[in-house]
Design a protein with these regions (language model features):
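Conserved short beta-strand elements that form part of the metal-binding/catalytic scaffold
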Residues: 29-62, 106-113, 153-162
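Vicinal oxygen chelate
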Residues: 14-17, 62-106, 138-145, 150
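Short amphipathic beta-strand starts and helix->beta connectors
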Residues: 46-49, 83, 118-120
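Hydrophobic, helix-prone linear segments
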Residues: 1-48
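N-terminal beta-strand motif that seeds the catalytic metal site of vicinal oxygen chelate
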Residues: 1-17, 61-63, 110-146, 150-157
């Protein structure tokens, strides 16, 4: 897949400790994070879905993938007609890029993983159940579908009525 491996849904958190306690009360488990970010950061997971809690000015929610060899990955995306909104590829920071779908939803690509997932039993789940999908609003279903298909996703039949 051109995006890489899915990492997390990044969320802006005004108080990371408070957010962490909230998600833990729902059955999520804290993952071990490194010092990848210059801001407070924590990750919780139910073993299937990881939520990155960032005390930073980020778009939220922000689906995030790990894309090794990010420079080359961005070249591949360009050949697919995908425009990169922002890229940081300097030696002083973690390599990352942000692109947007036709409806403006940002997606982030990181060159390296920012946490180590904990070992959880396959039977572990949060009190919320299992994560099924991440739905995005769009005014142009055809353009949005074409964008995501270029990135390797497979479209279901569109639902045109509520």
């Amino acid at each position: 897949m051109p995006l890489g491996r899915f990492l997390e849904i990044s969320l802006a958190a005004t108080d990371v400790a408070e957010s962490l306690a909230f998600y833990e009360s729902l059955g999520f488990v804290q993952a071990s994070v490194g010092e990848a970010w210059p801001h407070p950061y924590a990750v919780v997971t139910d073993g299937r879905l990881s939520l990155g809690l960032h005390r930073a000015d980020i778009a939220s929610p922000l689906p995030t993938w790990v894309a090794p060899a990010l420079r080359e990955r961005l070249d591949t995306l360009a050949t697919l007609g995908v425009t990169v909104d922002e890229a940081r590829l300097d030696d002083a920071s973690m390599h990352q890029a942000v692109l947007r779908d036709p409806s403006g939803q940002p997606l982030r690509l990181l060159e390296a993983r920012t946490f180590s997932p904990p070992a959880l039993s396959p039977a572990h789940s949060s009190t919320l159940g299992y994560f099924e999908e991440f739905a995005l609003a769009t005014l142009d279903l055809v353009a949005a579908g074409a964008f995501w298909e270029r990135l390797g996703f497979v479209a279901f039949e569109p639902v045109l009525e509520p």
